[in-house]
Amino acid sequence: MIPSKNIQKIKLVTFDAFGTILHLSKPVPIVYSEVAQKYGVHATIDEIEHNSNKAFKDFSEKHKNHGKKSGLNPHDWWIKVIEHSFPTPVPAEMAEELWSYFSKKTGYTIHPLLIDFLKRNKEERKYIIGIISNTDERIRTVLEDYGIDHLIDIYAFSYDVGFEKPSREIFDYAMEKAVKLLGQEIQPEECMHLGDDLIKDVSAARNIQWNAEYCDIKTNFLKYFEQK
């Protein structure tokens, strides 16, 4: 059952990260290629794209949740993905540079409405704001680089929580954090999640009686907060 949305009752608003509030400034294969050239590593864009997609898929299956299940930390997990994205061995410094690139705001564009929305909410204190993302702490460093990490109240990263969307546990984690911040109980229908994956974001949240709407980097998500 999908709850009827009454925006006046919403207390917790959560966003997905990648594809929703953050978008890659350049495609991954292009970034990899540009950095590789600096280190004399030669590979075509097609080779890098094929290898990086395969590496990400393989490591996601063998070492789930960015290595959480295997005892790997996210840094080492990503370094392995980067190393397997090229047909020849790569210098350690090159892999570290690529890791660092995607840990800063230069690697991303941010949703054009997000910063003003967060600043206004901080002043008005309408909602508890959270991020629910199948990722690790690195996303917080990106938001720190944008200077907005303090405008977000709750960070629910799958690596830290131990569960990935669409599992309800990661949504429950965010709601429990909101309860502690507010000092009062929150009902599922008082929560809203925005994300760009119809299964892992929208359906997953609605299945546990949250409000949920589709949102990507181009979506005017402010319309979801207009009282009908």
From Swiss-Prot:
Pfam families: Hydrolase. Its EC number is 3.-.-.-. It comes from the Eukaryota. One of its GO terms (molecular function) is phosphatase activity. InterPro entries: HAD-like_hydrolase_domain, HAD-like_sf, HAD-SF_hydro_IA, HAD-SF_hydro_IA_REG-2-like, HAD-SF_hydro_IA_REG-2-like_cap, HAD_sf. Keywords: Cytoplasm, Hydrolase, Nucleus. One of its GO terms (cellular component) is cytosol. It is found in: Cytoplasm; Nucleus. NCBIfam families: DREG-2 (TIGR02252), HAD-SF-IA-v1 (TIGR01549). Belongs to the HAD-like hydrolase superfamily. This is Putative uncharacterized hydrolase C7D4.05.
